[in-house]
């Protein structure tokens, strides 16, 4: 049996302000830093040890991973950062308050933008301050790779090749891996691992800062999955995510 740990970054400043974040490089809130410390201590107490770590190129995920590894005395292990693990790109919604957007467009429309599989939000323009082509960390990406907006289907399409080509072979070789990423990039992976339908994925919400453990067979098919920690706290955090897009 092989184990994989998935961790959504701790609460960010824009999570706290209930704003669409996407590829905007927002840092953790103080609560988010504490969530990361708690996650690291929990993993350490449960006896987890990692050989490799993967994360996005966004600081809220990177800082969460740093903090977790620091708590576990594992800051020395190899860490790979890749844009394919980024949050889904929220297009022209980035920076907008979710509740205010729901008041303007309706709860149902915002739910579709946030959680549907194949409906992207309105696209960003190249003149927008958040256009990723202006960011040096994406200088190596082609114009076809740079998103102006994404739905979850797009996020799956960019993440899964990296999973198959880079991460999965390490797990098959017996490496203990943690992936610290984002709500939607992790939803993309969970959809694949658990074979969740395009319709049912709408109901999947991943809370901030709580380790999700997968026990996998030799073919990397899930035997079971579970969140570590207090289950009542888990329910509260999931409910927070659910309510974010409502007016």
Swiss-Prot record:
Biochemical pathway: Carbohydrate degradation; glycolysis; pyruvate from D-glyceraldehyde 3-phosphate: step 3/5
Positions annotated to bind substrate: 8-15, 21-22, 60, 87-90, 98, 114-115, 183-184
SMART domains: PGAM
Chemical reaction(s) catalysed: (2R)-2-phosphoglycerate = (2R)-3-phosphoglycerate
GO terms of molecular function: phosphoglycerate mutase activity
Coiled coil: none
EC number in record: 5.4.2.11
Alphabetized HAMAP family for the sequence: PGAM_GpmA
Function: Catalyzes the interconversion of 2-phosphoglycerate and 3-phosphoglycerate.
UniProt family annotation: Belongs to the phosphoglycerate mutase family. BPG-dependent PGAM subfamily.
Name the record gives this protein: 2,3-bisphosphoglycerate-dependent phosphoglycerate mutase
Species assigned in the record: Chlorobaculum tepidum (strain ATCC 49652 / DSM 12025 / NBRC 103806 / TLS) (Chlorobium tepidum)
């Amino acid at each position: 049996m092989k184990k994989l740990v998935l961790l959504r970054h701790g609460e960010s400043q824009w999570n706290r302000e209930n704003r669409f974040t996407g590829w905007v490089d927002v840092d953790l809130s103080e609560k988010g830093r504490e969530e990361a410390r708690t996650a690291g201590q929990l993993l350490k107490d449960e006896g987890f040890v990692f050989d490799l770590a993967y994360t996005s190129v966004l600081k809220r995920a990177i800082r969460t991973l740093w903090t977790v590894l620091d708590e576990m005395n594992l800051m020395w292990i190899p860490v790979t950062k890749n844009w394919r693990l980024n949050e889904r790109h929220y297009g022209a919604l980035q920076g907008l308050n979710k509740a205010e957007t729901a008041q303007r467009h309706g709860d149902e429309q915002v739910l579709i933008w946030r959680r549907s599989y194949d409906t992207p939000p309105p696209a960003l323009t190249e003149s927008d301050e958040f256009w990723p082509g202006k960011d040096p960390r994406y200088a190596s990406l082609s114009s076809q790779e740079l998103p102006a907006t994404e739905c979850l289907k797009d996020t799956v399409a960019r993440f899964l090749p990296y999973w198959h080509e880079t991460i999965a072979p390490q797990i098959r070789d017996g490496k203990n891996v943690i992936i610290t990423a984002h709500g939607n990039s992790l939803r993309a992976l969970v959809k694949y691992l658990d074979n969740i339908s395009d319709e049912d994925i709408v109901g999947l919400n991943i809370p901030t800062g709580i380790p999700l453990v997968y026990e996998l067979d030799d073919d990397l098919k899930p035997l079971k999955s579970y969140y570590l920690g207090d289950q009542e706290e888990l329910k509260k955090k999931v409910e927070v995510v659910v309510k974010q897009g409502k007016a």
